[in-house]
């Protein structure tokens, strides 16, 4: 599911697995500018959202990051590095806060 006002940068490959949630107002950022160079060139890196991962409302996933299987980036958090599977992350930069334990079946 992709929520309203979600921003998918589309500057590089974006891989979205099965049962992924990109909540309202979340941003997937794949590009930036090299501020060290006089001509300020752009560059990009792919982003991967593996099966069952969840990007919370208003959260930001930065370039080159992978949300591994069933990881969660909570509301308003910023992922600047890969998120480990079945782990819930919070903050800026996002830090692991607890394990994601799933119950039931799909």
Question: Can you annotate each of these PLM segments?
Answer:
Residues 72, 77-78:
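A generic "structured core" feature
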Residues 84-85, 90-93:
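Acidic, glycine-centered active-site loop in nucleotide-sugar glycosyltransferases
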Residues 70-72, 88:
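Alpha-helix N-cap/helix-start motif at helix boundaries, enriched for small hydrophobics
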Residues 1-67, 92-93, 97-106:
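Flexible, glycine/small-residue-enriched loop-and-beta-strand segment within the central core
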Residues 28, 78-79:
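Conserved sequence/active-site signature of Rossmann-fold short-chain dehydrogenase/reductase
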